[in-house]
Amino acid sequence: MRYVAAYLLAVLGGKDSPANSDLEKILSSVGVEVDAERLTKVIKELAGKSIDDLIKEGREKLSSMPVGGGGAVAAADAAPAAAAGGDKKEAKKEEKKEESESEDDDMGFALFE
């Protein structure tokens, strides 16, 4: 992901076809170690593609990825059962609280890893 981001920054900066050295400068400016093999692979894969096409492809891939949530549902179902004889309003408040906490998760995506 870091190599794609650096590639896009280079293109936005005016380089139509950025070279390894261009991306190395961008990545080293923020303290990221560069794997030359991966960098070369990314440049080969992205060469000749427009930014709009790359973003479109990325959105399609992200929309097809499953997003978790199965564990949170199971935990929410277990809470009312554990509170046998408890107040239903209290259980609903707990359930809503659990849902809002899970919204803050990053879904396993790391921007620069």
From Swiss-Prot:
P1 and P2 exist as dimers at the large ribosomal subunit. Residues 66-113 are annotated as: Disordered. This is Large ribosomal subunit protein P2. HAMAP family: Ribosomal_L12_arch. Residues 73-85 have a biased composition (Low complexity). InterPro entries: P1/P2_N_sf (IPR038716), Ribosomal_P1/P2 (IPR027534), Ribosomal_P2 (IPR044076). Plays an important role in the elongation step of protein synthesis. The keyword Cell cycle does not apply. GO terms for cellular component: cytosolic large ribosomal subunit; cytosolic ribosome. Pfam families: Ribosomal_60s. The modification Phosphoserine is found at residues 100, 102. One of its GO terms (biological process) is cytoplasmic translational elongation. Residues 86-99 have a biased composition (Basic and acidic residues). Signal peptide: none annotated. GO terms for molecular function: structural constituent of ribosome. The gene is RpLP2. Belongs to the eukaryotic ribosomal protein P1/P2 family. Keywords: Phosphoprotein, Ribonucleoprotein, Ribosomal protein.
